[in-house]
Amino acid sequence: MLCLLCGYSGNILDIAARYLGVPYVAGALEGAGEEALVIDEQRLDCTTFVELTVAHWMAEQCDTLSFEGSVQGMRYRDGVVDGYLSRLHYFSDWVKENTERGVWSELTPTEADAHLWEADTLTLSFMSAHPQSYPYLKAHAWAVDSIRDIEANYRNLPIHYIKKSVLNLGPDELPIRNGDILALVTTIEGLDVTHLGFAVWKDDRLHLMHASMNHGKVVIDERTLYDYLSTRKSCPGVRVVRIRNEE
């Protein structure tokens, strides 16, 4: 269990806001070379933005946790850097591993808000089906079978997401809080999510703080999340993850 019960000193958005304006880069961790712990706070993709923010937050809560150690613990299976296959590539794998470590928990429907949610099942296969999209897999064909073995743990996985059609509701009607991690569910075969960021409530409307490809940097999107998703036909809604001490 992680030391996440130390004195609370601020919310996650305070730390996330430090990255506003930092340039966006696609695939910040992807490369064909040997795996190493990479921490680049000058260029962020959507995952490293969330990951580094949470790692800073964890380290600031407890003197026994370092920032670098927190990044490594979140990013790698069992917190050990042991090649490309030890990195938690899929959002669902990343969430499961760090839920078990006590970092966060994924929200699921309650009796009161069940009407806001959709249930589905998920089978991961995208990486093994598209190795040419990943520099390491393209250069090391032998690793594809190992990725497929990891994916096999996520066949017909039950998931719940909040429907995008209700994301225009206010903070008293949605279970989403400031600082929750929001992940955009996708209908792309074999993939779980395509993007993630933090929930930000502004004037009782939900927005996304994220490393944005369109803006080329970390922003609080000026569009509401409802409007942002209205043009994303492959996204039916969002999964919601809450950091443990933010509960």
Task: Identify the role of each PLM range.
Residues 1-9:
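Bacterial Sec-dependent signal peptides at the C-terminal "C-region" and cleavage site
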Residues 8-12, 38-46, 63, 174, ...:
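Extracytoplasmic/periplasmic, Sec-exported soluble proteins
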Residues 9-20, 29:
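Sequence/structural signature of beta-propeller domains
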Residues 24-159, 201, 209-213:
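Acidic/His-rich structured neighborhood in mature extracellular/periplasmic domains
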Residues 70-74, 168-174:
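Beta-rich nucleic-acid/ligand-interaction surfaces
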Residues 160-172, 186:
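Short alpha-helix capping/helix-loop boundary micro-motifs
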Residues 177-247:
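C-terminal soluble interaction/assembly domains
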